[in-house]
Amino acid sequence: EPGSAFTWQTGVLTSEVVDIVESRGIKTAILNVSFTCHMPDCLEMPYQPAVRGAEMGNEGEFIYRLGGNSCLSGDYMGLWSFDHELQIGERIVFEDMIHYTMVKTNMFNGIHHPAIALWTKEGKAEIYKQFSYEDYRDRMS
């Protein structure tokens, strides 16, 4: 990736667990982000983001598939091993995702874009852009 010389470790994509479902022995943590809408490189090529506090793979006690919030049947990413049982409302942080999240996103079926924010030195999130229905509507015209 030629651009990685300039855009390495650009920022995180923070998501939240909205539900946990189990089918055929696989637990899926449904997130409030979408792999197809917010992280398409994870589906289009073999890019595996680092997930804070987790390891890729099925070794360990707390194994989850991470699922996106779109209606696309393939909107999920692999199996991840966590050191604890995930809870609804818990934050899941994808490292080094902003460089593609902001330039390759789409609003498939009206899926919201994540807000663009920076953490201040005081630890407060300062929001620069919050996307709305009007942003979705305007992209359609």
Where are these regions (language model features)?
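Charged (often Lys/Glu-rich) extended helix/loop segments that serve as interaction or gating elements
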Residues: 2-141
